[in-house]
Amino acid sequence: MNTVIAFILIFGTLVFFHELGHLILAQRAGILCREFAIGFGPKIFSFKKNETVYTIRLLPIGGFVRMAGEDPEMIEVKPGYTVGLLFDSENKVEKIIINQKEKYPDALVIEVEQADLEHQMRITGYEHGNEDHLSSFSVSETSFFIVDGEEVQIAPYNRQFHSKTVWQRIKAIAAGPIMNFILAYVILVMLGLMQGVPSDEPVLGKLIDNGRAAEAGLQEGDRIQTINGENMRSWTDIVNTVREHPEKELKIVLMRDNVKLTKYVTPEAVKAGDETVGRFGAYNPVKTGVLTSISYGATETATVAQSIVTNLGKLVTGQFSIDMLAGPVGIYDMTDQVAKTGVINLLKLAAFLSINLGIVNLLPIPALDGGRLLFLFIEAIRGKPINREKEAFVVFIGVAFLMLLMLVVTWNDIQRLFL
């Protein structure tokens, strides 16, 4: 599979489901979601469904759901502004025309005296030609601004993010990472159904034709008891022992059809990174079945998550170097290497990256979902929200930190791969 396509498909899928989690829970809470975006930068494709514009942007390195009220509204109607009003069948303001009013001859033009488009949903002003009479108009809950011919939905306060309960906001933010864990689980269950679930029993699975194990007379189903006199209690024991003995003869005692046999195998020496290890051309056995696959999906998701959390802890304590982190360039190279081995391994990589994305997003760093959740938990404990300006300042610092970290990691990737 072409590496670029594989990278875009994997990364795009992970981002899509992450942002979909945010979108679904936000919409359930009644929050107006203005945009659901995959990628950053200029739009290359977009369409609108119901209240939300769905876009694909040029740089496939993330995504976002733009919820009303998270940022200051871009369009304001202040006293002294001249706007045009269009009405619905209930005589409520349906559209407020900000500019190019000449294109809407049916609009009632007023000079605004007062406008409350969040709580009271009313706009008051003087009609052109009747400046002595102040008129007040009720504004529909589903009204729009029209700016440069484009409609922008007005967000009453009850449709804004900060109007919702702390619990509703926590669910909307946490849903993104949770969706990544669910996606990884589903992928792993699919892999279990497609190829079986790897077993850690000390039993041989399929053998590679002309591999060292096959040449030595070993067969699928052989239960390994000892290697060089050491008891083999699991497949992991077998792998570790074989890895440690490249091109060194091993005495293997096994059971086959209730008969004890002794075989001699010399593992092939192969390069694995900077070291040489032994392999003997045998796979571990697999178990099949729906329940087995469901269980495997859960345990493997938990195992991978635990491993990632452990490594993050080592990063904090200095046991794990920042040079070992991979950014977009490193992930692209990883995708290139894995793509050469087939679709199954690409799916495994996608599951790993999905879990990784979920965990990283839960880190309590401002600008990440975890940082936003931290603010919400503090609000729940205090009983009142954190000052918006202070929160914005902390988020700015978080964004700067993440940008710096991304630059460092990307530079490390480039040095490691190309220099």
From Swiss-Prot:
<dbReference type="GO" id="GO:0004222">
    <property type="term" value="F:metalloendopeptidase activity"/>
</dbReference>
<feature type="binding site">
    <location>
        <position position="22"/>
    </location>
    <ligand>
        <name>Zn(2+)</name>
    </ligand>
</feature>
<keyword id="KW-0378">Hydrolase</keyword>
<dbReference type="InterPro" id="IPR041489">
    <property type="entry name" value="PDZ_6"/>
</dbReference>
<keyword id="KW-0482">Metalloprotease</keyword>
<keyword id="KW-0862">Zinc</keyword>
<comment type="function">
    <text>Is responsible for Site-2 cleavage of the RsiW anti-sigma factor. This results, after a third proteolytic step catalyzed by the ClpXP protease, in the release of SigW and the transcription activation of the genes under the control of the sigma-W factor.</text>
</comment>
<keyword id="KW-1003">Cell membrane</keyword>
<keyword id="KW-0645">Protease</keyword>
<dbReference type="GO" id="GO:0046872">
    <property type="term" value="F:metal ion binding"/>
</dbReference>
<dbReference type="InterPro" id="IPR036034">
    <property type="entry name" value="PDZ_sf"/>
</dbReference>
<dbReference type="InterPro" id="IPR001478">
    <property type="entry name" value="PDZ"/>
</dbReference>
<keyword id="KW-0472">Membrane</keyword>
<feature type="transmembrane region" description="Helical">
    <location>
        <begin position="391"/>
        <end position="411"/>
    </location>
</feature>
<feature type="binding site">
    <location>
        <position position="18"/>
    </location>
    <ligand>
        <name>Zn(2+)</name>
    </ligand>
</feature>
<dbReference type="Pfam" id="PF02163">
    <property type="entry name" value="Peptidase_M50"/>
</dbReference>
<keyword id="KW-0812">Transmembrane</keyword>
<dbReference type="InterPro" id="IPR008915">
    <property type="entry name" value="Peptidase_M50"/>
</dbReference>
<feature type="domain" description="PDZ">
    <location>
        <begin position="184"/>
        <end position="269"/>
    </location>
</feature>
<dbReference type="GO" id="GO:0006508">
    <property type="term" value="P:proteolysis"/>
</dbReference>
<dbReference type="InterPro" id="IPR004387">
    <property type="entry name" value="Pept_M50_Zn"/>
</dbReference>
<feature type="transmembrane region" description="Helical">
    <location>
        <begin position="349"/>
        <end position="369"/>
    </location>
</feature>
<feature type="transmembrane region" description="Helical">
    <location>
        <begin position="4"/>
        <end position="24"/>
    </location>
</feature>
<keyword id="KW-0479">Metal-binding</keyword>
<feature type="active site">
    <location>
        <position position="19"/>
    </location>
</feature>
<comment type="similarity">
    <text>Belongs to the peptidase M50B family.</text>
</comment>
<keyword id="KW-1133">Transmembrane helix</keyword>
<dbReference type="GO" id="GO:0005886">
    <property type="term" value="C:plasma membrane"/>
</dbReference>
<protein>
    <recommendedName>
        <fullName>Zinc metalloprotease RasP</fullName>
        <ecNumber>3.4.24.-</ecNumber>
    </recommendedName>
</protein>
<feature type="transmembrane region" description="Helical">
    <location>
        <begin position="173"/>
        <end position="193"/>
    </location>
</feature>
<dbReference type="Pfam" id="PF17820">
    <property type="entry name" value="PDZ_6"/>
</dbReference>
